[in-house]
């Protein structure tokens, strides 16, 4: 019986979680869940100068925001010194390691590989050959393990069956394969994801607009949109699907055989497109809750869902909400309606004012009934519906187009809507 899948995500707490790391975490998550296996979180914090606990905390927060849950961990390499020392001792006893001065003149433990090259198998690339491996440090002079040694020891101890990571680790994998063989332990299955490139074909960086996961979160991206887009950077659905509602659907649709080794190109506009699509699918209650932190003033009490429905179609980011809602709730220039449109605008505004006064709509259905009554009024007088509704829109918002009028009326409330209509009528009389 084949061993159950055990995968891991192993970030270094030297900064925030970036897109490449988030994709690696996602693909490990999908792989483990697809196979009914377990996913471990390991913090590779052996770099004492650069590793910070606050970075670790931020990485954990961002993984939680993405919805990526782990079955074990976090394990911290900085807390496992005795384990690494024990494995180094085995290599020393077997003549496969030795102590010598490092570049700083202090004593360190070096691995002496029995072979200077060889090959390992990659799930996407097949056989990968390597060579020219020199003796390298496995225990640094401060007692901390070097990256390649710690990774191998931990993957052995944690019974990792599959190592899924970025292509940039291919040079490390050759060294790690030699360590596995020296320790007499079978290697896990390796799978190296293709690089993520910018739109110009160069390695992805901040100059392409790429940010940390936290940066996207603070800008107003949804976790499900970011996950959706990241899943497509190196993977294709068998039927060409590109939109997925969230992790649960991605797990259900995941097919590891559709992973590719070619570089993927990051397109900021494509990510923005996915975010807008996911925003449109959100339930109004959740959307209102997510929008609130981006606003200086709270949404109108009792009309929170109407407010977000009013701007939903124009939202691309949660951070767009203040600007879009400000156009509706902010002050309107009374002169905006003066002189446009010509014809019976003043008469139409008077009719709208009377209807508001008599009906005082509080809900969407009542607002729709008011607008239907205004259309009937226009039809009885041989006026096109648009010629009656457009002056009302301009009076309420100062703009020629925008959200559906029923949302605007309910969002403003009958009193404010009435005031805006009266100010527009007065402005027309003065024009």
Swiss-Prot record:
Keywords carried by this UniProt record: Aminoacyl-tRNA synthetase, ATP-binding, Cytoplasm, Ligase, Nucleotide-binding, Protein biosynthesis
Swiss-Prot/TrEMBL GO biological process terms: glutamyl-tRNA aminoacylation
Record has Aminoacyl-tRNA synthetase as a keyword: yes
Protein localization: Cytoplasm
One Pfam family from the record: tRNA-synt_1c
Molecular function per GO: ATP binding; glutamate-tRNA ligase activity; tRNA binding; zinc ion binding
PANTHER family: GLUTAMATE--TRNA LIGASE (PTHR43311), GLUTAMATE--TRNA LIGASE, MITOCHONDRIAL-RELATED (PTHR43311:SF2)
Family, per entry: Belongs to the class-I aminoacyl-tRNA synthetase family. Glutamate--tRNA ligase type 1 subfamily.
Protein name, entry field: Glutamate--tRNA ligase 1
Organism of derivation: Rubrobacter xylanophilus (strain DSM 9941 / JCM 11954 / NBRC 16129 / PRD-1)
